[in-house]
């Protein structure tokens, strides 16, 4: 007999339920994606606009004990010249302060600047998912507009950042090369 009194709230976690919910949410938003249920991960093909240009991105959705994280790897730190680093870091710190629901962060292992947000499973409903997902896209759009003034080839550098993250995790996700980076399988 299961004694629920001994189970704390942090131990009640249903990964398949969250994974299935995310599948439905992505279908409702008509997104193209690959799903990796064995490692609780979605890769979503999307794009953001900068001026008249559409920039292809890969949005990563992953699950931790009580959290759903949405993130996009964007800039390898080693791609930013030493002359531009201070101005670039000032930009992302300013954006961290200005933009709600998103945070720029550093993956030290990969030397990658990423943007992310987290949603607690207690509030993981479609409206919140859509709002958090769109917050990432809006923040990226604003980031690219401002970063282009500092680093003119920011979109090329961002593509390298996404590829770097995917390469690190390719053994789990089946590998991606530059040509197939944005050709994800699943369409609703």
Model-derived features: where do they sit?
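A contiguous, mid-protein "functional segment" used to position or interact
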Residues: 123-160
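Short, highly charged C-terminal tails/helix-capping segments
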Residues: 148-188
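Charge-rich, low-complexity N-terminal segments
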Residues: 1-56
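Short, internal acidic amphipathic alpha-helical interface segments
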Residues: 71-112
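A generic structural motif
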Residues: 74-80, 119-128
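Short, aliphatic-rich beta-strand segments
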Residues: 113-117
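Hydrophobic-cavity lipid-handling domains and compact docking modules
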Residues: 41, 45-82
């Amino acid at each position: 007999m299961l004694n629920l009194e001994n189970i704390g709230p942090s131990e009640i976690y249903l990964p398949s339920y969250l994974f299935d919910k995310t599948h439905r949410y992505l279908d409702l938003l008509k997104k193209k994606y690959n799903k990796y249920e064995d490692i609780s991960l979605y890769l979503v093909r999307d794009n953001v606009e900068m001026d008249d240009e559409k920039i292809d991105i890969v949005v990563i959705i992953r699950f931790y004990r009580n959290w759903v994280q949405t993130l996009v790897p964007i800039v390898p730190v080693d791609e930013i010249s030493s002359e531009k680093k201070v101005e670039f870091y000032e930009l992302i710190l300013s954006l961290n302060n200005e933009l709600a629901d998103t945070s720029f962060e550093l993956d030290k292992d990969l030397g990658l600047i990423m943007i992310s947000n987290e949603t607690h499973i207690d509030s993981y409903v479609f409206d919140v998912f859509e709002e958090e997902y769109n917050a990432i896209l809006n923040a990226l759009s604003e980031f690219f507009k401002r970063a282009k003034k500092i680093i003119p080839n920011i979109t090329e550098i961002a593509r390298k950042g996404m590829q770097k993250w995917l390469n690190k995790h390719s053994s789990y996700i089946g590998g991606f090369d530059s040509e197939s980076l944005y050709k994800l399988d699943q369409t609703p």
